[in-house]
């Protein structure tokens, strides 16, 4: 159970840090000329990873806690 608690806390910390990074970088990318066209695949990948973290944390929270 201790390993799960540590893993869960690490995932929540990763979500917080990744969200902070997205809040800082996405407006810069969208404000730059041709930012969307040049970085479209990176933006979608980052959004997919963020949603994956949110759903993974939600599922783990519902199952184990």
Swiss-Prot record:
One of its GO terms (cellular component) is chloroplast thylakoid membrane. The keyword NAD does not apply. Keywords: Chloroplast, Membrane, Photosynthesis, Photosystem II, Plastid, Reaction center, Thylakoid, Transmembrane, Transmembrane helix. The keyword Transmembrane helix applies. It is found in: Plastid, Chloroplast thylakoid membrane. It comes from Euglena gracilis. PSII is composed of 1 copy each of membrane proteins PsbA, PsbB, PsbC, PsbD, PsbE, PsbF, PsbH, PsbI, PsbJ, PsbK, PsbL, PsbM, PsbT, PsbY, PsbZ, Psb30/Ycf12, at least 3 peripheral proteins of the oxygen-evolving complex and a large number of cofactors. It forms dimeric complexes. One of its GO terms (biological process) is photosystem II stabilization. Belongs to the PsbZ family. The chain crosses the membrane at residues 11-31, 44-64. May control the interaction of photosystem II (PSII) cores with the light-harvesting antenna, regulates electron flow through the 2 photosystem reaction centers. PSII is a light-driven water plastoquinone oxidoreductase, using light energy to abstract electrons from H(2)O, generating a proton gradient subsequently used for ATP formation. InterPro entries: PSII_PsbZ, PSII_PsbZ_sf. It is a multi-pass membrane protein. This is Photosystem II reaction center protein Z.
């Amino acid at each position: 159970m201790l390993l799960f608690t540590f893993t869960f806390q690490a995932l929540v910390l990763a979500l917080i840090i990744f969200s902070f990074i997205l809040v800082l970088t996405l407006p810069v990318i969208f404000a730059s000329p041709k930012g969307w066209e040049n970085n479209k695949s990176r933006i979608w990948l980052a959004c997919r990873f963020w949603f994956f973290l949110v759903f993974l944390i939600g599922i783990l929270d519902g199952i184990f806690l």
